[in-house]
Amino acid sequence: LLADEFCGGFALTPDETAFVRREPLVTLADVTSFCEEVPGARGVNILRRAIRLAADGAASPLEALVRHWLHVPVEHGGYGTGQSAFNVAVDVGEGFGSGMPARRTRVIDICYPRQRCGVECDGLQHESSAQSDDDAHRQTQLSNVGYREERISWKQFSSYQRACEA
């Protein structure tokens, strides 16, 4: 999980109530290169295993958490869904969906391109009615080009996490 966060493009605000976009602290290529430079160093084998589970490009803490939860093998408490990518742009063409303004691309937070499916991680900003309308339109556009998208909100995820800890 830390590798996904270090390789992500976000940082928490000082009061930890929101996040802002920023350049990643490192990339997986940087970490892999480091492991090759110090092959016998303490902890390098653990780091190598961690980066096999990680991906570059998370845009929020929720994306990093959900992708990690989905990707980690079942025997380690995850769902073992296999490799996915963060924030994949999908061409939806023009004019698909309802009469709302068309966007040529939509970005899927956690995407499985070969399976043409993904997960949209809805933070608290997705609670407004305007955002709900855009989310519904987005889902229609993706469906029209053969992508299935599931959604998970921060409230759902934190509730599930609390239930699992009980």
Where do the model's predicted regions map?
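Nuclease-adjacent, charged terminal/linker segments that flank catalytic cores
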Residues: 1-33
